[in-house]
């Protein structure tokens, strides 16, 4: 009686495994439901294909959401019922992160569906980077159209653009990217899909999961001319192209055994060049004396002679160079040889046309530099989409580029004009990466800090306009060179012609005298204050003494010594909110952290300065000053403070789940955190750190990044804490400052330790160690290991290529290995001994975002158990060759 139950369990297990495999297979897919509002769930699983679609909102700045008419919705799958339309700009571009030099299948779908009620089907252009890909004519293809291309990007960013060419409004329904194996479809250029068919008269349309690359296969069969054969045995499809097994399980042979199998079609354009990929498998059980051998011909010429299909395997035959059609029709034939006893056979066929993309994209380094400048100044320019320089009529505002007569040569940025753009902060360091820049105009903004030395090193510059800002300090000597026009008027604090040195030398003697007198006065004042305080304390009997206090030598006036708009609490209020410091939730060199409540409901953490803390007031002051000027969802927020003579306390939001370390270790009742949540926590901590480095002026280095300083709220949202060691950079463009070494052993940047030169990359190193802790759940330093430091131990284990020895065993293998490898590589890159080889926090955050998206897809696919439905869908663009 138990057999049916066991059978059911086995079936469920099998389905779970299949679902898991499918989820992993589409980890690197990009499937965008264009126009899906962010107010709805931002991703979902399409029930027919099992593909995971997400909103396109984060990949494009422009456009509005639309939906096809309700009466048409049942005719299309869910991802194609919405659309994004573009009523404003002439060119609107998606920007997608891809792997440079990796081949992709790129597919775009367009369905008008009378979304606007105007019955006005649009015509517009589709561009890939700066080149025309296709003209989209929805007046001709009223039910929708699709464009599909095989393309190898030459940079890590891919722009897909919709360009308005008339009075109608461009739109897009879905955008899909599928990475392919680099050993398939080896051609010099890109390939535009003409048709992809498998020869079967009964089965229908195939795509993912039958095809692991999500290629679309239409069944095609000429009933009057062909005979179908099929097999129920499994066909091996393990060549570089991996056509679907279902497509190989059937084949067509000529009904007349002596006749050729012929497929012909008229070319769209007389000069079209074709690549054909024919997939063959012998699926018939041949008798002892049976032979199947045939020649493959193109327009009457033999391209493959005496071919014998492999038994239940697959061979893909393709032309090595593009071919054209000689007459009105292109003719593809399979003719059996005189030795063959059986007719020719064909299982599946792909036909592509060569598409030329003659215009090169802008130099990749220039593109990265301009985007970094855009990020540094938080610019939001609608026209800054797609390629910055080409086509020239769509070039970004404020940029002038080299106008090469040779369009195959990448353009370079020659001029950058950001005048009157509301810029604040320092002159962005990314400008120096525009190595061909001739003209720079940053005039009429509110830039501060010094004029950076790197401008003097940019030898191609002939004009620099910095007028109308708040720059200060001396000009670099290199900017006084002949041939350079430098405009700096309207910067009253800027020192010209050595005036800074002269002014300082004139004031040197008076300053020394004043400083000496002031020093004596301060010493006398301090002695008097100490004497008064000691007399006051000796006369106080029975006064309540706090458990942790320290006499401070600072202003005893009623006004606080720390300027703040946050709430100032009295010491008696601190005692009340902590119930006389009853519940201690943490402690360190500064003192203790106590739990408290305000108004009986709002929970807070109260950091109280310890009497034994030698650097206490300095670090306390630093933390308060920093928390007053930073505001980010992934940084602990300040509630208030107490600065009442010798009583100092900092009150900030209470995070009830404690720190990350205790959850990884399982100590103090910390709950287990799965791999997906670990990735999310790492990303949130990275975003907080990125804000300190890039979102603050001047930038801030935390100096003590570690798992115990990453706190978690009720939903396990991560926030960085403990800013007592943090340092701000001088406003100027320096990347390092010299300082006394401080931090936690094991997390401390070895380069910073040796040179005392602190930089943002010092935090990156510490964050890399945190990532290794998140991955391994191992102590940072463990003398019992052969390699005591965690980075050395992981590096040693990586040489063996087995991540199971590195991963936290508590995860029980519940993770996607590719995302783990990416995070491991990222962690080791962050922990590189040399700071120049480490990424910045923006790069770290972006990489973690991609890893988290992959992991979320895996988890969501594992949870999906929706039944599949068969939905028929047709596009007017599907081209079917006719056979004879």
From Swiss-Prot:
Q: What class of enzyme is it?
A: transferase
Instruction: Outline the subunit composition.
Output: Binds to the ammonium transporter AMT1-1.
> Where is the protein situated, by its record's location annotation?
Membrane
The LRR repeats are found at 412-433, 436-457, 460-480
Protein's name in the database = Probable LRR receptor-like serine/threonine-protein kinase PAM74
Residue ranges of the TM segments: 511-531
Q: What kind of membrane protein is this, topologically?
A: Single-pass type I membrane protein
| Membrane side Cytoplasmic: residue ranges | 532-884
Q: Transmembrane as a keyword? A: yes
Q: Which organism is it from?
A: Arabidopsis thaliana (Mouse-ear cress)
What is the top-level taxon of the source organism?
Eukaryota
What keywords is this UniProt entry annotated with? ATP-binding, Glycoprotein, Kinase, Leucine-rich repeat, Membrane, Nucleotide-binding, Phosphoprotein, Receptor, Repeat, Serine/threonine-protein kinase, Signal, Transferase, Transmembrane, Transmembrane helix
Annotated catalytic residues: 704
| Taxonomic lineage | Eukaryota, Viridiplantae, Streptophyta, Embryophyta, Tracheophyta
Q: What positions does the domain Protein kinase occupy? A: 579-852
Q: Which reaction does it catalyse?
A: L-seryl-[protein] + ATP = O-phospho-L-seryl-[protein] + ADP + H(+); L-threonyl-[protein] + ATP = O-phospho-L-threonyl-[protein] + ADP + H(+)
User: Where are the disulfide bridges?
Assistant: none
Q: Where is this chain primarily localised?
A: membrane
Glycosylation, residue list: 143, 182, 200, 256, 289, 400, 403, 417, 433, 444, 465, 470
Q: What's one GO-annotated cellular component?
A: membrane
Positions where Phosphotyrosine occurs in the chain: 652, 752
């Amino acid at each position: 009686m138990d057999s049916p139950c066991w059978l059911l369990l086995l079936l469920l297990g099998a389905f779970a495994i299949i679902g898991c495999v499918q989820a992993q297979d589409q980890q690197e897919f990009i499937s965008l439901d264009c126009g899906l509002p962010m107010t709805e769930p931002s991703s979902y699983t399409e029930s027919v294909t099992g593909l995971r679609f997400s909103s396109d909102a984060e990949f494009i700045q422009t456009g509005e959401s639309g939906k096809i008419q309700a009466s048409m919705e049942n005719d299309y799958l869910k991802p194609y019922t919405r659309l994004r339309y573009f009523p404003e700009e002439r060119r609107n571009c998606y920007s997608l992160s891809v792997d440079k030099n990796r081949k992709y299948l790129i597919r775009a779908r367009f369905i008008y569906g009378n979304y606007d009620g105007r019955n006005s089907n649009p015509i517009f252009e589709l561009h890939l980077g700066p080149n025309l890909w296709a003209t989209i004519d929805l007046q001709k293809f009223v039910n929708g159209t699709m464009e599909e291309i095989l393309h190898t990007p030459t940079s890590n960013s891919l722009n897909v653009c919709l360009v308005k060419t008339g009075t109608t409004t461009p739109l897009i329904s879905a955008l899909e990217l599928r990475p392919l194996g680099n050993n398939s479809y080896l051609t010099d250029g890109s390939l535009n899909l003409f048709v992809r068919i498998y020869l079967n008269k009964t089965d229908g349309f195939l795509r993912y999961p039958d095809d692991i690359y999500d290629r679309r296969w239409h069944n095609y069969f000429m009933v009057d001319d062909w005979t179908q054969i099929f097999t129920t045995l499994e066909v091996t499809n393990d060549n570089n192209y991996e056509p679907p097994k279902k497509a190989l399980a059937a084949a067509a042979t000529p009904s007349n055994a002596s006749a050729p199998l012929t497929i012909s079609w008229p070319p769209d354009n007389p000069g079209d060049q074709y690549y054909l990929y024919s997939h063959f498998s012998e699926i018939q059980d041949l008798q002892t004396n049976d032979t199947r051998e045939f020649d493959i011909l193109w327009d009457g010429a033999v391209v493959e002679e005496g071919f014998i299909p492999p038994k239940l395997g697959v061979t893909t035959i393709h032309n090595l160079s593009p071919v054209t059609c000689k007459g009105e029709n292109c003719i593809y034939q399979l003719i059996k040889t005189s030795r063959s006893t059986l007719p020719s056979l064909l299982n599946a066929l792909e036909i592509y046309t060569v598409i030329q993309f003659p215009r090169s994209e802008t130099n990749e380094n220039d593109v990265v530099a301009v985007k970094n400048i855009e990020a540094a100044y938080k610019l939001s320019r609608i026209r800054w989409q797609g390629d910055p320089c080409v086509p020239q009529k769509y070039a970004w505002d404020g940029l002038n580029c080299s106008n090469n007569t040779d369009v195959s040569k990448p353009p370079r940025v020659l001029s950058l004009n950001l005048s009157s753009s509301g810029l604040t902060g320092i002159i962005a360091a990314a400008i120096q990466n525009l190595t061909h820049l001739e003209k720079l105009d940053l005039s009429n903004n509110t830039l501060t800090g010094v004029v950076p030395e790197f401008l003097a090193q940019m030898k191609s510059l002939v004009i620099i306009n910095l007028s109308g800002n708040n720059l200060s300090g001396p000009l670099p000597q290199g900017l006084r060179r002949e041939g350079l026009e430098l405009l700096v008027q309207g910067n009253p604090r800027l020192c010209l012609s050595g005036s800074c040195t002269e002014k300082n030398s004139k004031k040197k003697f008076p300053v020394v005298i004043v400083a000496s007198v002031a020093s004596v006065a301060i010493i006398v004042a301090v002695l008097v204050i100490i004497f008064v305080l000691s007399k006051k304390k000796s006369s106080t009997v029975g006064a309540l003494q706090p458990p942790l206090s320290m006499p401070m030598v600072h202003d005893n006036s009623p006004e606080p010594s720390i300027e703040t708009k946050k709430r100032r609490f009295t010491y008696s209020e601190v005692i009340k909110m902590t119930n006389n410091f009853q519940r201690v939730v943490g402690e360190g060199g500064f003192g203790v952290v106590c739990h408290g409540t305000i108004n009986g409901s709002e929970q807070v953490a109260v950091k109280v300065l310890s009497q034994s803390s030698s650097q206490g007031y300095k670090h306390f002051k630093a933390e308060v000053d920093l928390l007053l000027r930073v505001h980010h969802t992934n940084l602990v927020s300040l509630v208030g403070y107490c600065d009442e003579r010798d009583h100092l306390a900092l009150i900030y939001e209470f995070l009830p789940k404690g720190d990350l370390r205790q959850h990884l270790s399982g100590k103090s009742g910390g709950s287990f955190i799965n791999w997906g949540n670990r990735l999310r926590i790492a990303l949130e901590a990275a975003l907080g750190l990125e804000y300190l480095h890039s979102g603050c002026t001047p930038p801030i280095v935390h100096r003590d990044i570690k798992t115990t300083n990453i706190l978690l709220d009720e939903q396990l949202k991560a926030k960085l804490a403990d800013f007592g060691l943090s340092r701000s950079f001088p406003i100027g463009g320096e990347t390092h400052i010299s300082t006394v070494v401080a931090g936690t052993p094991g997390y401390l940047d070895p380069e910073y330790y040796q040179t005392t030169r602190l930089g943002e990359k010092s935090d990156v190193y510490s964050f890399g160690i945190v990532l290794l802790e998140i991955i391994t759940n191992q102590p940072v330093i463990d003398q019992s290991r052969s390699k005591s430091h965690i980075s050395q131990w992981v590096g040693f284990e990586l040489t063996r290529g087995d991540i199971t020895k590195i991963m936290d065993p508590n995860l029980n293998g519940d993770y996607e290995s590719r995302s783990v490898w990416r995070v491991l590589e990222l962690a080791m890159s962050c922990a590189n001994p040399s700071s120049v080889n480490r990424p910045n926090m923006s790069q770290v955050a972006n990489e973690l975002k991609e890893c988290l998206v992959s992991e979320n897809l895996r988890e969501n696919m594992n949870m999906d158990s929706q039944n599949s439905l068969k939905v028929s869908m047709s596009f007017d663009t599907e081209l079917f060759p006719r056979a004879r």
